[in-house]
């Protein structure tokens, strides 16, 4: 046989050994427990995680984000549109899907630099509360609401989503759930 045949036999034998080995079954259970433990995201840890990622110099983010500082989930409905247009289209698409109107209250969980919340208020007249754990994003979002004359319609709060107690007509969260963990 060839070297390739030998490596295939070794690989199959190793996989069989792993599947039947008591030691590796225990190892797998311990490994899964450790993975689960690392995914527990207590509020204090959430704040640290968000800060270490988003409380960096915003100039860095401006190098690769769209002009509205949208972080994820751009909607490229065709290949010929720019990142700015794709992010704008994403916000419009979400607002349309949620059927938001001016009589509604909306919660934006993980609001980032405020782009989604501000767009909702501009397009619909709804009252929007955006929450974030990032101090830099919070300051920028507040400044943007003031500059755009939307501070009567949009409120930004430095808060964990688990502390929110109000009732809303709609809740939106774009690209935040990867930070949630298991708790």
Predicted regions and their residues:
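Conserved SAM-binding motif I beta-strand of class I
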Residues: 127-132
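Conserved SAM-binding loop of SAM-dependent methyltransferases across substrates and taxa
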Residues: 113-124
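N-terminal auxiliary segments of SAM/dcSAM-dependent transferases
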Residues: 2-64
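Conserved class I S-adenosyl-L-methionine
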Residues: 102-110
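Conserved SAM-binding loop
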Residues: 141-142
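A conserved beta-strand element that flanks and buttresses the S-adenosyl-L-methionine
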Residues: 172-177
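A short acidic, Gly/Pro-enriched loop at the edge of an enzyme's catalytic core
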Residues: 162-171
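Conserved SAM-binding strand-loop segment of SAM-dependent methyltransferases
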Residues: 148-161
